[in-house]
C-alpha cells in the first residue's frame, strides 16, 4: 500500500481501512500463536500499513484545522 494512494482517500475511507487492518493484525497474531505463520513478515507489513494510514489521517486533520 503506497502513501500516495492513501492521500486520495477520504478520512472516513481511511478509518474503515484502518479498522480492517487492525482486525487482520489481530487474526495474524492469533494464528501465529496457535499454528505459526508461513509468512511472518505479514505482521510487520500490516503494522506498517496501519502506521501509514494513521500518518495520512493526522496530516489530513491538521490540514483541515489550519
From Swiss-Prot:
One of its GO terms (biological process) is translation. InterPro entries: Ribosomal_protein_uL29, Ribosomal_uL29, Ribosomal_uL29_sf. Pfam families: Ribosomal_L29. It comes from the Bacteria. GO terms for cellular component: cytosolic large ribosomal subunit. Keywords: Ribonucleoprotein, Ribosomal protein. The keyword Ribonucleoprotein applies. Belongs to the universal ribosomal protein uL29 family. This is Large ribosomal subunit protein uL29. It comes from Hydrogenobaculum sp. (strain Y04AAS1). The gene is rpmC.
